[in-house]
Amino acid sequence: MYISNIICTFAQNFKHTDFGIIRNMNKVRITAIRQTIYHDLIAQYENPIEHACDVRQGQQWTSINGKCPEGLCPSAWDSMQPFVESLAQGKGNFFDGWMKNPMSAMISCNDGFRPFSFYIEVIENLASSHE
């Protein structure tokens, strides 16, 4: 089992709490927006592989309670997990107004040869910021 699968499994079983009190968390939608493939970098640096990525443009997942959604690429989850968890907890406005929708983020997976960009947004606002 890959370490990222273990991390994703752990995240699915972890309950977010504030001082031991479980609170409502936002539902967060994750949408695969676009993939860029760097054929020149693949040719120069990567050993041939048969299968690289199962994600398809337009695919969507819903994170409930900040957990890794079933079927989401574990490597992509590693990249977006802090943003999904923050949005689920009612925190947003990353980097002082980076996104037009302050309760969203655009994150790419960490595959340097064929990164996928994901739009992450709150779809059900149950939490409020506790700052």
Task: List each language-model region with its residue ranges.
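Short, compact, well-ordered microdomains
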Residues: 84-131
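Short, compositionally biased
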Residues: 69-91
